[in-house]
């Protein structure tokens, strides 16, 4: 199947604290994507610095790491046709003020510093992020019984 790919999605501490984990998972499942891996953890500062290494020179970097370390996160891997691009559309813009209603950030966020969710921005970054957060044996390979009802 063309463009069957995986993406990394993380529900940030504010999304966990606000009780949005189930709603976010529901949206990805209802879209037809397949959950491949999930863990609930409090990421270390070092782990977060590695995750956000591309932003290390930005003025908001220390605050971002502190915010992401302030509570537990839900790290997930989702698989599906064009899941990276479609997942980003489902999330909405990084700045919730620019997000359309119906997107996760458009429906549940107000400020960019509390935008509840992270999603890989490319297939390449998804591969990097997945390998940073999950060991290969933690990725569960199975065929969803819904697969044939989602894909031609």
Curated annotation (Swiss-Prot):
Hexamer of two different chains: A and B (A6, A5B, A4B2, A3B3, A2B4, AB5, B6). Interacts with CAPN8. Interacts with AKAP13. Interacts with ITGB1BP1 (via C-terminal domain region). Interacts with BCL2L10. It is found in: Cytoplasm; Cell projection, Lamellipodium; Cell projection, Ruffle. Its main location: cytoplasm. The keyword Transcription regulation applies. The active site is at 118 (pros-phosphohistidine intermediate). SMART domains: NDK (SM00562). One of its GO terms (molecular function) is DNA binding. PANTHER family: NUCLEOSIDE DIPHOSPHATE KINASE (PTHR11349). It comes from Homo sapiens (Human). Its EC number is 2.7.4.6, 2.7.13.3. InterPro entries: NDK-like_dom (IPR034907), NDK-like_dom_sf (IPR036850), Nucleoside_diP_kinase (IPR001564), Nucleoside_diP_kinase_AS (IPR023005). Its cofactor is Mg(2+). SUPFAM superfamilies: Nucleoside diphosphate kinase, NDK. It catalyses: a 2'-deoxyribonucleoside 5'-diphosphate + ATP = a 2'-deoxyribonucleoside 5'-triphosphate + ADP; a ribonucleoside 5'-diphosphate + ATP = a ribonucleoside 5'-triphosphate + ADP; ATP + protein L-histidine = ADP + protein N-phospho-L-histidine. It holds the Pfam family NDK. GO terms for biological process: cell adhesion; CTP biosynthetic process; GTP biosynthetic process; integrin-mediated signaling pathway; negative regulation of apoptotic process; nucleoside triphosphate biosynthetic process; positive regulation of DNA-templated transcription; positive regulation of epithelial cell proliferation. Keywords: Activator, ATP-binding, Cell projection, Cytoplasm, DNA-binding, Kinase, Magnesium, Metal-binding, Nucleotide metabolism, Nucleotide-binding, Nucleus, Transcription, Transcription regulation, Transferase. Belongs to the NDK family. Residues 1-66 are annotated as: Interaction with AKAP13. This is Nucleoside diphosphate kinase B. Major role in the synthesis of nucleoside triphosphates other than ATP. The ATP gamma phosphate is transferred to the NDP beta phosphate via a ping-pong mechanism, using a phosphorylated active-site intermediate. Negatively regulates Rho activity by interacting with AKAP13/LBC. Acts as a transcriptional activator of the MYC gene; binds DNA non-specifically. Binds to both single-stranded guanine- and cytosine-rich strands within the nuclease hypersensitive element (NHE) III(1) region of the MYC gene promoter. Does not bind to duplex NHE III(1).
